[in-house]
Amino acid sequence: MYGIEYTTFLIYLISIILFNYILKSITRMMDYIIYKFLLIITITSIFDSAQNYGINLPITGSMDVSYVNATKDEPFLTSTLCLYYPTEARTEINDNEWTSTLSQLFLTKGWPTGSVYFKEYDDIPTFSVDPQLYCDYNIVLMRYNSSLKLDMSELANLILNEWLCNPMDITLYYYQQTDEANKWIAMGQSCTIKVCPLNTQTLGIGCQTTNTGTFEEVATAEKLVITDVVDGVNHKLDVTTASRTIRNCKKLGPRENVAVIQIGGADILDITSDPTTTPQTERMMRINWKKWWQVFYTIVDYVNQIVQTMSKRSRSLDSAAFYYRV
């Protein structure tokens, strides 16, 4: 009887010792695997952080900020509309209650009070540096100015399309545009952008890479620049203003919750001729210039027709994302 008890005790003791040994072996093996993995990651990160001169960086970031998407299409009663207008409109109207008046008029078209937001901007160059379009539907009013035709056209191209962007370090790298949808977009204070195309030996074509004075000037004293160069050719860039931010961007397609309305002007802005605009229609319209009250009355009358050319999207445009997001 006592022999059986001793045997049982020894079996339990041996089992515990064996189990403890197995656990220690597994622990040592896991430690080895983890340390090995961390060592590989550390070595790899060192190589990844090294400078890599003369490469064409891939585009992986985005200037679009995603917010919660609706699970179903909602009627205008549950949508928001932002109306962007220049300061001169408020100055000319000179009525502290003018937005309240327009809100009541929008109500007659099915837009509840509080669903329409009036957003003021100083001028086209200022707005182009910091466009923020957050509503379900966004209508931008641009008063035609012959001296700002380029800024207006590039602003329309920027806000009417979605872009995938990466920051550019022009002090270390040279860049090339891979196709027609690939552009370099710069925002900031007034500056000049110059480029020097390179041959396969990375020597300048018609310019000297060490002398920016020989570079070809593609933009002069602008706040918003969408630069297009010859595809498949490496370029060295020079930006004269340090505060300007330039990004390597690719046009993804139309931003369908934005419309641009040109106010007045003998010339009509048109960006549909751009081969990257597909289909060849854009949400750009024109209203004859009269008085700002007349302009707003016209927009109220046709707001639902305008919105029907648009579609509610799950992305908003925030220039802060353009500057900082990788």
Swiss-Prot record:
Gene3D superfamilies: Glycoprotein VP7, domain 1, Rotavirus outer-layer protein VP7, domain 2. GO terms for cellular component: host cell endoplasmic reticulum lumen; T=13 icosahedral viral capsid; viral outer capsid. Residues 253-255 are annotated as: GPR motif. N-glycosylated. Disulfide bonds join C82-C135, C165-C249, C196-C207. Ca(2+) 1 binds at D95, G206, T214, E216. One of its GO terms (molecular function) is metal ion binding. InterPro entries: VP7, VP7_1, VP7_2. Pfam families: VP7. Transmembrane segments: none annotated. Ca(2+) 2 binds at Q177, D228, V229, D231, D301. Residues 1-50 form the signal peptide. It is found in: Virion; Host endoplasmic reticulum lumen. Residues 165-167 are annotated as: CNP motif. Keywords: Calcium, Capsid protein, Disulfide bond, Glycoprotein, Host endoplasmic reticulum, Host-virus interaction, Metal-binding, Outer capsid protein, Signal, T=13 icosahedral capsid protein, Virion. Glycans are attached at N69, N145. Belongs to the rotavirus VP7 family. Some rotavirus strains are neuraminidase-sensitive and require sialic acid to attach to the cell surface. Some rotavirus strains are integrin-dependent. Some rotavirus strains depend on ganglioside for their entry into the host cell. Hsp70 also seems to be involved in the entry of some strains. In group A rotaviruses, VP7 defines the G serotype. Homotrimer; disulfide-linked. 2 Ca(2+) ions bound at each subunit interface in the trimer hold the trimer together. Interacts with the intermediate capsid protein VP6. Interacts with the outer capsid protein VP5*. Calcium-binding protein that interacts with rotavirus cell receptors once the initial attachment by VP4 has been achieved. Rotavirus attachment and entry into the host cell probably involves multiple sequential contacts between the outer capsid proteins VP4 and VP7, and the cell receptors. Following entry into the host cell, low intracellular or intravesicular Ca(2+) concentration probably causes the calcium-stabilized VP7 trimers to dissociate from the virion. This step is probably necessary for the membrane-disrupting entry step and the release of VP4, which is locked onto the virion by VP7. This is Outer capsid glycoprotein VP7.
